[in-house]
């Protein structure tokens, strides 16, 4: 692997407008070759998508997805810049795919890391700091281990960080950026709600016993 310097990352950011982590990943994937890293970002749809990310996305559409068996349902708001794009096939296909992703990810609660409340982050930190396998370790090492574990846990709660269900080499964020690059507009997942049949309803023991008995008869 080539030597990935801060200057190399900065040069790639200046050329593409992509985020620092995306630039680092691109350079790592291409062994520090700037031209190949630029091409890698373009193939991922990141280079041009990042330049659009600051533009206002106030149009869009609210989509719904009901999973087979009608036991899980999703409502999701996806925003773009114009009504014309919102009606297009690429946008509508993305809306459906991201809604399906939410249905497949029961632990996801937030769109992005930025949405996670500070008290949730602090709670996760306290849980990790109190784990038995960290006892006796120097404080500095403990902090680094906890930081890594918290980052992993928080990413599990975030929609944009999830591996795309149809192609695990992409994240949902990559998928959105690719669509933004194709249509030439900023696209944002604004919010979503996931419904599970019977969620929050406590079944009594008789209902459960009857279900088991019925299954045995069949």
From Swiss-Prot:
GO terms for molecular function: translation elongation factor activity. It is found in: Cytoplasm. Residues 82-85 are annotated as: Involved in Mg(2+) ion dislocation from EF-Tu. CDD domains: UBA_EF-Ts. It comes from the Bacteria. InterPro entries: EF-Ts_dimer_sf, Transl_elong_EFTs/EF1B, Transl_elong_EFTs/EF1B_dimer, Transl_elong_Ts_CS, UBA-like_sf. Keywords: Cytoplasm, Elongation factor, Protein biosynthesis. Associates with the EF-Tu.GDP complex and induces the exchange of GDP to GTP. It remains bound to the aminoacyl-tRNA.EF-Tu.GTP complex up to the GTP hydrolysis stage on the ribosome. PANTHER family: ELONGATION FACTOR TS, POLYPROTEIN OF EF-TS, CHLOROPLASTIC. This is Elongation factor Ts. It comes from Prochlorococcus marinus (strain AS9601). The gene is tsf.
């Amino acid at each position: 692997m080539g030597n990935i310097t801060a200057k190399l990352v900065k040069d790639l950011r200046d050329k593409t407008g992509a985020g620092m982590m995306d630039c680092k990943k691109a350079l790592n994937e291409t062994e520090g070759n700037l031209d190949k890293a630029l091409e890698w970002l373009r193939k991922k749809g990141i280079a041009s998508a990042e330049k659009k990310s600051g533009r206002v996305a106030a149009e869009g559409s609210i989509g719904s997805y009901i999973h087979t068996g009608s036991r899980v349902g999703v409502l999701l708001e996806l925003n773009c810049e114009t009504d014309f794009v919102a009606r297009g096939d690429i946008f509508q296909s993305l809306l459906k795919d991201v809604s399906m992703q939410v249905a497949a990810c029961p632990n996801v609660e937030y769109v992005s890391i930025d949405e996670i409340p500070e008290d949730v982050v602090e709670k996760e930190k306290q849980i990790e700091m109190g784990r038995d396998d960290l006892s006796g370790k120097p404080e500095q090492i403990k902090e680094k281990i906890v930081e890594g574990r918290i980052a992993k846990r928080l990413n599990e709660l975030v929609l944009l960080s999830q591996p795309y269900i149809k192609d695990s080499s992409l994240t949902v964020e990559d998928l959105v950026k690719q669509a933004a690059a194709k249509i030439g507009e900023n696209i944002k997942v604004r919010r979503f709600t996931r419904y599970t049949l019977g969620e929050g309803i406590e079944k009594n023991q008789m209902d459960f016993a009857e279900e088991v008995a019925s299954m045995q008869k069949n």
